[in-house]
């Protein structure tokens, strides 16, 4: 007996393991001599950065820094800022790590700051470090059979298979001037960066990424009136990422995550602090897919032998959409009771969101947290935290039972309008990148064995008369009488695999 089963594969990204670890941040800081005494702490912020990720065997190690920034009013009535870095290193061990791509994210959970004296600060905080390890899960299925008298029923599905995933870290840095129109720098208060992809091109296992890194810096000006200034600078991103099997037909989903950002002030030729030295550590996370039409065997039997087959529920993914979109989020913030006269600065502290599929729309809904540095009518500087809700909707033509949708959101801009009635209209621009997958579950045969030692007894009758009802499937009739669907169609001059009206059929012997 000559029997052959042809196989194919469906593949998807699988989370092999995930672990969240806590990294406490505790320090006692004494002000350097060049900074004046503390009168009142306005805001203490803790920003977590991952500078390097190393994988060795079944261990992945993440090194990073918790950057503390304390904004305070001095005893001389001036706005001051103190910065200090707290290095940390954490590792995670799991047997699955060795064969996975590992992604490490750090997030500030909380930070508390207390002025022990005019020159000492007691700070306690916590950073959560999440280790996520991803692999490409592959499942074999039967796509065709020949020999052994085996008959198969197949269906064709469009499948978006994962070819591979990769991660690469790189640095973008530049020294630039703040511009003649702006006053010189006294101290940097905070810096924020966003990386946006403008174009990608895949050729023979390599992907060229072109984009922009925008760095925004808030600083205290070298003036006598607590003046805050903002400067913005854009740097090009040009990187090549190696991804196995990536080509001009592959679908490449890329996320640029800024894992570390350092901005420092430098003197120009005249000795004034008018230069900024900015350096960003960026990690490019790439997933590569390919869409193809695939034949899958959903039922099988042999007219000659007994067979054993394994029917397995299998998730089939189809790419419905891949997009990058810009959305402007608007919210009205209540400032009643704050006696606010003007706003010195508004910054985005974080975005929390959930995703869902509502009828024919994708929905992202959540809250945007903002920090406000204000000046009261009595000329007192204060700090406030506020948040507002936002929604993003996108119409889609879904092709599956359920949807997988994991957006990547980057804040690309913000501004505000202070109203007369103790309210502030905040506007935050976000860039949303996402791939939208529809998922269907199909019962397919993943294994089949023909038992040549158990032949079937042939039918004694050359023809069998069967009275079929409208809507019956020729495949089911053929399987029941152990013959082939092609012979039934040929014998009865049928036009397809469905009985269109109540009739008498002649069932030939196989």
Roles of regions detected by a PLM:
Residues 1-458:
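Interfacial loop/beta elements and low-complexity acidic/Ser/Thr-rich segments
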Residues 452-490, 495-510:
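Primarily a LysM-type cell-wall glycan-binding module
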């Amino acid at each position: 007996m000559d029997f052959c089963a042809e196989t194919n594969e469906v593949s998807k990204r699988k989370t092999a393991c995930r672990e969240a670890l806590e990294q406490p941040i505790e320090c006692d800081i004494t002000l350097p001599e060049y900074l004046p005494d503390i009168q009142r702490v306005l805001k203490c912020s803790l920003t977590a950065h991952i500078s390097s990720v190393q994988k060795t065997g079944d261990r992945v190690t993440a090194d990073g820094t918790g950057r503390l920034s304390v904004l305070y009013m001095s005893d001389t009535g001036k706005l001051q800022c103190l910065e200090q870095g707290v290095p940390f290193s954490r590792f995670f061990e799991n047997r699955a790590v060795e064969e996975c791509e590992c992604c490490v994210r750090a997030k500030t959970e909380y930070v508390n700051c207390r002025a022990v004296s005019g020159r000492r600060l007691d700070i306690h905080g916590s950073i959560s470090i999440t280790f996520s390890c991803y692999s490409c899960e592959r499942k074999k299925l039967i796509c065709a059979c020949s020999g052994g008298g085996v008959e198969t029923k197949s269906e064709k599905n469009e499948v978006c298979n994962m070819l591979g995933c990769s991660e690469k870290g790189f640095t973008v840095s530049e020294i630039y001037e703040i511009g003649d129109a702006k006053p010189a720098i006294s101290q940097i208060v905070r810096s924020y960066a966003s990386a946006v992809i403008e174009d990608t091109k895949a050729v023979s296992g390599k992907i060229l990424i072109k984009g922009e890194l925008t760095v925004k810096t808030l600083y205290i000006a070298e003036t006598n009136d607590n003046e805050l200034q903002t400067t913005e600078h854009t740097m090009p991103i040009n990187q090549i990422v190696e991804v196995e099997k990536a080509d001009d037909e592959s679908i490449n989903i890329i996320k640029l995550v800024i894992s570390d950002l350092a901005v420092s002030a430098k003197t120009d030729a005249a000795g004034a602090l008018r230069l900024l030295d900015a350096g960003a550590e960026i990690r490019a996370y790439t997933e590569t897919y390919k869409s193809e039409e695939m034949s899958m065997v959903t039922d099988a039997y042999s007219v000659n032998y007994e067979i054993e087959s394994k029917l397995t529920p299998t998730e089939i993914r189809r790419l419905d959409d891949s997009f990058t979109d810009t959305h402007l989020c608007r919210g009205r913030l209540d400032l009643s009771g704050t006696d606010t006269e003007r706003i010195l600065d508004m910054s985005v502290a974080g975005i929390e969101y959930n995703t869902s599929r509502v009828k024919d729309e994708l929905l992202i809904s959540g809250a945007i947290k903002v920090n406000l540095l204000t000046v009261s009518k009595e000329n007192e500087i204060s700090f406030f935290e506020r948040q507002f809700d936002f929604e993003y909707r996108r119409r889609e033509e879904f092709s599956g039972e359920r949807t997988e949708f994991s957006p990547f959101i980057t804040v690309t801009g913000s501004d505000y309008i202070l109203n007369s009635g103790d309210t502030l209209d905040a506007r935050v621009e976000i860039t949303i990148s996402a791939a939208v997958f529809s998922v269907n579950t199909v019962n397919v045969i993943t294994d089949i064995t023909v038992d040549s030692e158990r032949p079937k007894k042939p039918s004694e009758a050359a023809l069998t008369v069967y009275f079929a009802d409208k809507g019956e499937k020729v495949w089911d009739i053929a399987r029941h009488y152990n013959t082939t669907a092609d012979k039934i169609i040929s014998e009865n001059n049928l036009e397809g695999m469905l009985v269109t009206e109540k009739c008498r059929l002649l069932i030939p012997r196989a």
